[in-house]
Amino acid sequence: MTEPVYAAIEAGGTKFVCAIGTADGTLRERVRFATRDPDNTLAEARGFFEAAAQRHGTPQALGIASFGPLELDPNAPLYGRLLRTPKAGWHDADLIAPFAHLGIPVALDTDVNAAALAESTWGAGRRPDGTPLDTLVYVTVGTGIGGGVVVHGRTLRGMMHPELGHFCPRRHPDDLGFAGICPHHGDCLEGLANGPAIVARLGHELGSASPDHPIWDIEADYLGQLCALIALTLSPQRIVLGGGVMQHARLFPLIRARTQHWLGGYIARHQVETG
């Protein structure tokens, strides 16, 4: 008997990744392509799954992890659509309807919520015995800044979904002259601390910044404020930091120190690991 397969989409602002795999996470086939306009991008994804079904069998279900913001309430008129996204041309794009003809269940969540669920299932959100932690927050710091929250195996949803990148931190004293680049809030966390914001200050690519450049202290301060906010409001058992900016390992001890600073000794329990 053929092992059941599942379909998945990682819908990013610059690229789409479509895959077929099994329930244990084994990939059978994967393809990636550039994110263009909604019609052409979603048509390419649809074509991949139609062809893949001939090779691997009809998937049991499709999971879509997308950039946002998204309408995730199945009872809402705009369910499955992108809302006020900064991605040009994608406002009001329907991510579910193009795959209705596959005749399989479709699950939708944000890319960071999905990443949080993956960390909880297979990655850094597990205890030493392999069981998942009860609560986890995953933060990505890259082109954008976002956070996903898992509580007892389910991603957190409410009025919409967490948008941790859009709180407004206290400005670093050496960064008062930078206006921020968020089109909605200017100097929110994303507008101050995402990859493009760092590049805007440096005037060159992030990878060429020296390890002792003061930008890292500024970046760590803003991310430390975020971690302190998460600890005080959501009280997760673990915060996982990922994304392109976090490839700069020097940030981890700096963020840890600034998190402790902003917590002010109010929460003494902490554990920071890198890897």
Feature locations, PLM:
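ATP-binding/phosphotransfer module of carbohydrate and carboxylate kinases, centering on a glycine-rich
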Residues: 1-61, 70-79, 96-105, 121-133, ...
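Active-site glycine-centered loops adjacent to acidic/histidine catalytic or metal-binding residues
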Residues: 10, 111, 142
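Short, small/polar residue-rich loop motifs at catalytic or cofactor-binding pockets
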Residues: 14-15, 142-144
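A short acidic/small-residue loop/turn micro-motif
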Residues: 35-36, 162-165
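A charged helix-plus-loop insertion that forms the helical arch/lid used to bind
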Residues: 76-91
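General beta-strand structural signal in soluble alpha/beta enzymes
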Residues: 106-110
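Active-site histidine-anchored catalytic micro-motif
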Residues: 147
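A cytosolic small-molecule/anion-sensing beta-strand core signal
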Residues: 151-152
